[in-house]
Amino acid sequence: KIAVIDGYYAYTGGINIADEYANLIVRFGHWKDSAILLEGDAVWSMTVMFLSMWDHCAGLEEDFDRFRPPAAPVRPWTGYVQPYNDTPLDPEAVGQSVYLNMIARAKKYIYITTPYLIVDVATNTALCNAAKSGVDVYLITPHIPDKRYVFEVTRAHYPPLLDAGVHIYEYTPGFIHAKNFVVDGRFATVGTVNLDYRSLFLHFEDGVWLCDAPCIHDIERDFQDTLTLSEPITLRRFRHLNILLQLYRSILRVFAPLM
């Protein structure tokens, strides 16, 4: 999701162009999402991402410099902002690398919101190891699903994480579609990358990595506000599941790389 206006402003995040994203219609309860607005030099990175995709789809080879606007004054800013994109045409899994790097940097806490939790072994291991090492790892996922089978696979991934000490909450008012990480109040990312195989390895995605930027406090505050509206999930709940539901989830996990 990329929107660039005149080369001076850029938006990205989880928000698509559809009525439910603005809660103009209700499909899965309250739709909770996030996005980030960029100004300044970082906008050029988003412009190049869009133009690269445009040229790939249209079979063009344009001179991108003609789309670069004259420099404009921007507000004083502290910290670092780095937009990034991920593409299946490149063997490097950029989105996964960003997430794994952030998890590895954590000393105190990790706050994550994701609509889907269908993680590969590396990501699952990183989250579990962080929790076992004393880092407070908090995950918020939806309580009302948009895709039932994906929801069941997401829940099938809960037990190993809960057993390692990861705190998992479900957003009870509806469907949370935000894809955010916050680490120790110093690092954050907002973008389109879900914690699932398709998003990490098969889709065209993008995001913005932040370090010591003032808006990180806004992202963290939004997480805390969302947490108050979410229900904690306990491991005990999964130890007494209906055997047929356990079998159903186990079968679905086999197809996790396709989800």
Predicted regions and their residues:
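Charged, low-complexity intrinsically disordered terminal segments
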Residues: 1-259
